[in-house]
Each structure stands twice: as C-alpha cells, then as structure tokens.
C-alpha cells in the first residue's frame, strides 16, 4: 500500500539509497534541472522520479505527491525540503511542513522515518569524487500516520473536546490551528530522525 518515506538529506545519493532499501518504486519530486542531461533524465524517469518546475510552487508539488499516494505508491520526501548545505555537522536542519500537509491529506497512510548515515562519505556536496566503498546505513523507525499522531497524547493530543473547539472556529482559526499541528508533526519527525542518528 501507499506510504511516505521521510529521511534526512545530505547527499545526492539519498534518493537512490531509499529506493534500494524499499525494494519497490519510490517516487520523488525532483527539480527540472536533473532532467536536462539525457543520461540523467533517463535514470530519473526509469526510477519513477517526477520532474517539478520550481515555479509551480508548493501547491503544485503537493498535488503531484497526492497523485502518487492516491494510486498506492511510495512517496519519498525529505522533510528539510532540500539537501543540507552545511559543511560541518549537525547537518540536519529544521523541517518544512510539506511532509505534514501531505500526511494530513492521507491521515491513515504510514509515514516511515528513515535516517540515512554515511551518504556524505560516498559523495559530499561540492565534491565530484565518489567513494563507492563507503558504508551507508539506513535506520528505520516505527511508522506513524498523521491520524494516529493527532490522537496520541505525546503528539497532537487531539481529543474530542479539542475537535469540538476546532470545529467551532472560523476558517482562519482552523487554518491557524492546523498550521500548529503541521509544525508539531514535522518537528517531532525531525527529532525522530535525530534520535535515530541522522547527522
């Protein structure tokens, strides 16, 4: 069934690592520049990557991810939103809430935290030298759906009273509350990746 694979992003090989670990196609939103080179374009297309123009914005990217999950596919996502640009650890940055917004569209779909360790040893940003012998490790934690996280007292803690309060608000108030939930889910996901050892 569908799932969201969420991991840290320190190297160009991170998507490949997730694809190999999943043993079934994993789709990613990839910037259009990755499709400019014919060889790279063929690789991206053959592995199910989705070409995304920067100017379509977050809503357009989310719509494409929704299509993947709606058809029962695996959607890979990097909660940080981009590859880490830091030259020294810690590389893990604050997450963007796109992962939570996507998970909220499919509240029963599992979000699988995947910490990728050692990817920078294979190929580091700005370094064209590839070390094919470097060890890369993927540590996977228990999946959690957005719906389960919302109901969990250690997560969103959305009980019956909170639901009533949420429904009593106008649209602006509801959006404000949901933004807080998205931020909370994302922050806990990033903290899970850190706990798993993501550098």
Feature names for model-found ranges:
Residues 1-57:
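Catalytic core of membrane glycerolipid acyltransferases/transacylases, capturing the structured
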Residues 62-199:
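Non-catalytic C-terminal accessory region of glycerolipid acyltransferases
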């Amino acid at each position: 069934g569908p799932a969201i694979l969420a991991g840290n992003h320190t190297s160009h090989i991170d998507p490949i690592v997730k694809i190999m670990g999943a043993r079934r196609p994993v789709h990613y939103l990839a910037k259009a520049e990755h499709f400019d080179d014919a060889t790279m374009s063929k690789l991206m297309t053959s592995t199910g990557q989705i070409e995304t123009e920067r100017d379509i914005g977050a809503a357009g990217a989310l719509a494409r991810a929704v299509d993947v999950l709606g058809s029962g596919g695996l959607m890979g996502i990097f909660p940080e939103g981009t590859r880490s640009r830091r030259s020294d650890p810690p590389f893990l940055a604050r997450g963007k809430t796109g992962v939570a917004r996507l998970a909220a569209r499919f509240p029963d779909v599992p979000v699988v935290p995947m910490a990728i360790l050692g990817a920078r040893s294979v190929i580091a940003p700005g370094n064209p030298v590839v070390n094919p012998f470097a060890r890369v490790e993927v540590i996977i934690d228990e999946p959690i759906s957005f719906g389960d996280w919302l109901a969990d007292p250690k997560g969103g803690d959305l009980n019956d009273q909170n639901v009533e309060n949420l429904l009593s608000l106008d649209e602006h108030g509801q959006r404000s509350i949901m933004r807080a939930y998205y931020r909370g889910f994302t922050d806990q996901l990033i903290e899970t990746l850190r706990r798993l050892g993501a550098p």
